[in-house]
Amino acid sequence: EEALPQITVIHKDLLEDGWQNSFEGADRVYHIAADPDVRGSARKSWEVYENNVSATVRVLEAMKEYDVKEIVFTSTSTVYGEASVIPTPETYSPMIPISIYGASKLACEAMISSYAATYGWHAWVYRFANIIGSRSTHGVIYDFVQKLRANPTELEILGDGSQSKSY
């Protein structure tokens, strides 16, 4: 944040009020807030919907209110579901998510697309796979790292080795 003084990072709960005026004078919004828990999304489907879809609509409404015409959105490769084409191109269809999380991010993409078309905005959507960071608690990369820490000479891979991913 200090290295890029022209960027304002908003550390707020997007489901609450009070952050919207931060968009005043902004040229572009980078919407990276989300509940990224694919595995846990089945247990807390309403919470995932609120934190992803409702929060995104609130961002879009604030953009409309403050006349911000560009949005960059971080989505996920889980919007593709069980893709039959590997590697999976961005134009792959139909997108049939198999997780609540993937469905919520696809709904966000649809809302962003509709707002952009309706209000003449520009939107960029990036579909990332296997995002990891210091607060990660699970996932394939996290599991690999934990297994290698436990035994640096051997990496146990689950499954029969025939699985493939688009990355």
Set out the residue ranges of the language-model regions.
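Glycine-rich phosphate-binding loop and adjoining beta1-alpha1-beta2 segment
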Residues: 1-4
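Residue(s) in the substrate-gating loop at a strand-loop-helix junction
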Residues: 76
